[in-house]
């Protein structure tokens, strides 16, 4: 049972993702760390972003303590998920709860439920972080100048560096790490994922995988890394949009090499002078006047983090980021190719995989096999 009118910022709940909100609301009143303002049944909406865990907005009516009402966010695995290791709600909840004292930009946790009888799976609930989230373009009504956009960009990079500076031992998060060898594990793991998910219509990527395997640097440090650090996971202050008030989506966070995190983040970083295919793949406003280029991001991050990273050294992290993104896209394309999803948004993911392999080869100066990806991906 769900509400007919969804809360602001969320759409209607899809039928296959619906749940008994009265049962969840009752459980929350009994188990929330702070149950103030949780009387009654909230209206419910579903956020449409992301391709993994499901995210809902619960909006409670106004009360004396919360005159504007109270908004909570509920996170759960996809319906029907059996492999809990891939959608570990307990891990995601506990990581943010432990991190909050050292990195206050994480949302405040409200409750974790492991009783699958309540909703059909385990889930957790957190306070909603109020603010703006940038998508493909900066809304013109924000009136951000190039100078203001640059300040926002620098603040985002500094936020990532601040996260990497958290003392994981003091925060009680060291158990997330598996010790030295993070780079090697990532190269081997993502290569295996690509081979398992490959379909006949995409490159074999063996040349890029072989290069990564043969040019692995030693770990450059051990830090808490986000692993999905993008503008659409950052919440901005509406009154001061150059200020970040929240960092969302900690599903992939772990302890590992901070430069691998930066490389993964910059795979999504499309700048104004990129080729037409790369510009078509853009999902965040990193092309806007004032945004730093990828090279400037690396330079600023290295200065902030106290690291020395040469252009040649950075090449490994750049190619790894592009390859990792290709694997993520291919895992989705695999489902589309085999008819497991008919979402039209996934129709060009195979061409995107081919392009990312092409771009990786270009960075490495390797010969290009087969057809030019720009001919297979619509750039109009």
What are these regions (language model features)?
Residues 224-226, 231:
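Catalytic-loop of the protein kinase fold
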Residues 177-178, 309-320:
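All-alpha amphipathic helical-bundle segments outside canonical DNA-binding/catalytic cores
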Residues 234-236:
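Hydrophobic residue at the +6 position relative to the catalytic HRD Asp in the kinase catalytic loop
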Residues 307-311, 325-380:
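Helical subdomain adjoining the active site within ATP-dependent kinase catalytic cores
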Residues 2-37:
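Juxta-kinase regulatory segment immediately upstream of eukaryotic protein kinase catalytic domains
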Residues 248-253:
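Activation of the activation-loop gatekeeper triad in protein kinase-fold domains
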Residues 260-306, 320-338:
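Active-site activation/catalytic loop segments of kinase-like enzymes and analogous catalytic loops
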């Amino acid at each position: 049972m769900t509400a007919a009118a969804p809360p602001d910022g969320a759409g209607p709940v899809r039928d296959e993702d619906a749940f008994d909100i009265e049962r969840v609301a009752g459980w929350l009143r009994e188990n929330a760390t702070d149950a103030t303002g949780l009387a009654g049944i909230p209206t419910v909406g579903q956020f449409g972003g992301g391709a993994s865990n499901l995210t809902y907005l619960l909006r409670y009516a106004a009360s004396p303590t919360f005159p504007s009402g109270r908004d909570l966010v509920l996170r759960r695995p996809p319906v029907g998920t059996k492999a809990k290791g891939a959608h570990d709600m307990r891990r995601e909840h506990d990581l943010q709860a432990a991190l909050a004292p050292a990195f206050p930009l994480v949302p405040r946790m409200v409750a974790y439920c492991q009783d699958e009888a309540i909703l059909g799976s385990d889930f957790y609930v957190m306070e909603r972080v109020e603010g703006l989230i940038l998508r493909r373009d900066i809304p013109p009504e924000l009136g951000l100048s190039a100078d203001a956009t640059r300040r926002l960009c620098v603040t985002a990079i500094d936020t990532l560096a601040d996260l990497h500076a958290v003392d994981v031992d003091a925060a009680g998060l060291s158990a997330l790490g598996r010790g030295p060898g993070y780079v090697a594990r990532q190269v081997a793991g993502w290569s295996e994922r690509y081979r398992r998910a490959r379909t006949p219509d995409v490159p074999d990527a063996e040349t890029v995988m072989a290069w990564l395997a043969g040019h692995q640097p030693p770990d450059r440090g051990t830090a808490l890394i986000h692993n999905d650090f993008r503008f659409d996971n950052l919440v901005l202050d509406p009154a001061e949009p150059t200020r970040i008030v929240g960092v969302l989506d900690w599903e992939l966070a772990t302890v590992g090499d901070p430069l691998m995190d930066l490389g993964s983040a910059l795979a999504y970083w499309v700048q104004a002078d990129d080729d037409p295919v790369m510009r078509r793949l853009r999902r965040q406003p990193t092309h806007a006047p004032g945004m730093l280029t990828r090279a400037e991001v690396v330079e600023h991050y290295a200065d902030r983090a106290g690291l020395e990273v040469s252009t040649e050294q950075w090449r490994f992290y750049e190619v790894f980021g592009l390859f990792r993104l290709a694997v993520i896209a291919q895992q989705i394309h695999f489902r589309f190719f085999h008819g497991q999803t008919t979402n039209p948004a996934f129709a060009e993911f195979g061409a995107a995989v081919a392009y990312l392999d092409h771009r990786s080869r270009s960075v490495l100066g390797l010969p290009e096999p087969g057809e030019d990806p720009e001919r297979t991906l619509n750039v109009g």
